UniProtKB/Swiss-Prot annotation:
It catalyses: Endonucleolytic cleavage to 5'-phosphomonoester. Digests double-stranded RNA. Involved in the processing of primary rRNA transcript to yield the immediate precursors to the large and small rRNAs (23S and 16S). Processes some mRNAs, and tRNAs when they are encoded in the rRNA operon. Processes pre-crRNA and tracrRNA of type II CRISPR loci if present in the organism. Homodimer. Its EC number is 3.1.26.3. Its main location: cytoplasm. Residues 158-226 form the DRBM domain. This is Ribonuclease 3. Belongs to the ribonuclease III family.
């Protein structure tokens, strides 16, 4: 029984090219040649994005584009994709240098996320670029988890996490939050918070600092998404 056979059984897909699945789990510290997951991860990033958006559009045909974009931000985040990888014990299959293994890097959310994306790219390529098959397998394993997250209150409200995931992934920077005013009586205060990122600034108001930050982050997310759309 080869090292990936148990995973293949769990997924319900048998790789024709065993080197391809091995490559999907090979960290650059283990192999600095082209035999690591970096290129597969590049393809897998777009593939997982597409399959996730497809689930959202089919499940919520009446949601506005802005709402779907914000939901997608959570569902393709490093943290969430790493949790999907952990649900299939991906950390057990990662090929990594001894030094990185001692540091526990095989459980690092960033690496788990990369491997998760690379794995789906590997299936897509190995199947002869069969998008229908790849999408069917992905939905079989993760559609219920994705929809469960969409319906959870924590996902709907945590715009700060979504914003930080996007800014760190694309620009390697974090937004900054400042309280700019607190008004009203002690029992009914209104907080105004600004969110700063690069040359952008948004504000949010709420009856707590936390809520005001979420509103400011939500507004910043919308601006960034609008700006990205203008570039395409």
């Amino acid at each position: 029984m080869d090292s990936f056979e148990l995973l293949e059984e769990k997924i319900g897909y048998r790789f024709k090219d065993k080197n391809l699945v091995k490559k999907a789990f090979t960290h650059i510290s283990f192999s600095k040649s082209s035999e690591n997951y970096e290129v597969l991860e590049f393809l897998g990033d777009a593939l997982v994005n597409f399959m996730t958006v497809n689930i959202l559009v089919e499940a919520f045909p009446n949601k506005k584009e802005g709402e779907l974009s914000q939901l997608k931000s959570f569902l393709i985040s490093e943290e969430f994709l790493a949790s999907l990888a952990k649900s299939l014990n991906f950390e057990k299959y990662i090929l990594i240098s001894k030094g990185e293994e001692l540091k526990g890097s095989n459980k690092n959310p960033s690496i788990l996320c990369d491997v998760f994306e690379a794995f789906w790219a590997a299936i897509y390529i190995d199947s002869g670029y069969d998008c229908k098959l790849t999408k069917s397998l992905f939905e079989h394993h993760f559609k219920s988890q994705i929809l469960e997250m969409v319906n959870s209150n924590s996902l709907k409200q945590d715009y700060k996490t979504a914003l930080q995931e996007i800014t760190q992934k694309k620009w390697k920077e974090r937004p900054i939050y400042n309280v700019i005013s607190v008004e009203g009586p002690e029992h009914r205060k209104t907080f105004t918070v600004e969110c700063l990122f690069k040359d952008l600034r948004t504000t949010g108001k709420g009856n707590s600092k936390k809520y005001a930050e979420q509103e400011a982050a939500k507004n910043m997310l919308q601006i960034i998404q609008d700006n990205e759309k203008k570039k395409t």
